[in-house]
A protein has these predicted regions:
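Metzincin-family zinc-dependent endopeptidase catalytic domain
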Residues: 1-70, 77-80
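Surface-exposed aromatic
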Residues: 8, 49-53, 84-96
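A general structural signal for short secondary-structure boundary/capping elements
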Residues: 57, 82, 96-100
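Extracytoplasmic/secreted envelope proteins and their assembly/folding machinery
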Residues: 63-67, 84, 104-108
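Post-HExxH zinc-binding segment in Zn-dependent metallohydrolases
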Residues: 88-118
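Pan-zinc metallopeptidase signature
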Residues: 114-115, 119-134
Length: 134
């Protein structure tokens, strides 16, 4: 259910945003919010990730954009300089529809890192919000 999900996917065009003084549109965007929740009698930190993908894209571009944004949702916040990676900074002529070996290895590394998500909290935590660089 959406109330329990950590990742919510929306078919909506992300708002344009200003980058280095220039307004830019994008096919997708991911926003991370760290929330203080109460579950099973315990307070803990959980990620709440909103993924937005423009609905008007052709099928391959929509799939590639969704895969790229899900990479951000799963913790890959940076971009790759290699155009054949899902997390390449922009889609080339041929959208990447399958994660590369580099993408998979990076995700495996991220998943092995320690996190405070799920830990019991004793003091209130101020919410934080972050947005992917596209």
């Amino acid at each position: 259910s959406p109330e329990q999900a950590n990742v919510l996917i929306h078919r909506q065009r992300p708002a344009r945003r200003q980058v280095a003084g220039v307004w830019r549109a994008s096919n997708g965007r991911t926003q991370l919010q760290v929330v203080d929740v109460q579950r099973q009698g315990r307070r803990r930190l959980e990620p709440l990730v909103k993924v937005m993908v423009s609905p008007g894209l052709r099928a391959e571009a929509l799939q590639a954009t969704a895969l790229h944004e899900l990479g951000h949702a799963f913790g890959l916040w940076g971009h790759s300089s290699v155009p054949t990676d899902v997390l390449a900074i922009s889609q080339g002529e041929r959208p990447v529809l399958v994660p590369s070996q580099r993408d998979r290895l990076t995700l495996e590394w991220v998943m092995q890192q320690t996190t405070r998500f799920g830990s019991t909290l004793r003091k209130p935590i101020e919410p934080a919000e972050s947005e992917s660089p596209e």
